Amino acid sequence: FGPAAAAYAASPVHRAGADLDAMLALGREVAARRVLDVACGAGHTALAFAEQADEVVALDLTPAMLEQAAALAAERRLTNLRFERADAAALPFPDASFDLVTSRLAAHHYADPAAAVREAARVLRPGGRLMLSDIVASDDPALDTFLNAFEVLRDASHARDHRIRQWCGFFRDAGLAPEVLGPWPMQIDFDAWVERIRTPPASVVGLRALFDHAPAPSREAFGISDGYDFRLTVAVIVGGISAGS
């Protein structure tokens, strides 16, 4: 992700969205003062929460992403952020450290999403919330397979777009009672999508062929256009730690 960091800093779908608006609104509602943004990427979510929280810790595994996030924070003159390099499945913080843990458009890269959810739950204070936004797969097995096939072809680091019910299961297993915000459609510009992650030319050809030969239900579900633009689905899963925990 290092070479792609600048492209993610400029990405419209990472900079804004209905899912981010919903996360920010809930953050204000619960008056979260100390926030951890996991797999922060270029920092858009962390910076947005820094506008309304006392302190935000932005965490990512990729140094270039952290550098981009720090540069954006400096541009906006935000001084209540700090940046740390660490893995979502091994958070370097004590138990009960944060009012809110967020992760946006990143969890499809998690090698062990269940472990990441458990770690997020561990560092939440009583009454705290985990808010995880990501692209979600359909409960239809054929649509699920098609989605994850083209995601991997575009980006070999893709692990899986999970179904909403799978995320809810991860939350329950970590002791979090899940609720779902959304889902919302996310319109994708094909050319920008492959350029952002520097998809190899041969894989771009493969993606176009995959879309050209997609079954009618897949073309309809993903809104695939003649120019290859298409539509994904995003949802936010929210889980809370009981104040009595």
Question: Where are the language model's segments positioned?
Answer:
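Conserved class I S-adenosyl-L-methionine
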Residues: 1-30, 44-48, 65-68, 131-153, 192-194
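Class I SAM-dependent methyltransferase SAM/SAH-binding core
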Residues: 36-38, 42-90
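Conserved Class I S-adenosyl-L-methionine
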Residues: 42, 113, 177-245
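A short acidic, Gly/Pro-enriched loop at the edge of an enzyme's catalytic core
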Residues: 89-100
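A short SAM/SAH-binding and catalytic strip from SAM-dependent methyltransferases
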Residues: 99-111
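A short glycine-rich, Lys/Arg-flanked "PGG" loop and its adjoining helix->strand segment in the class I
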Residues: 114-126
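Short alpha-helix
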Residues: 160-174
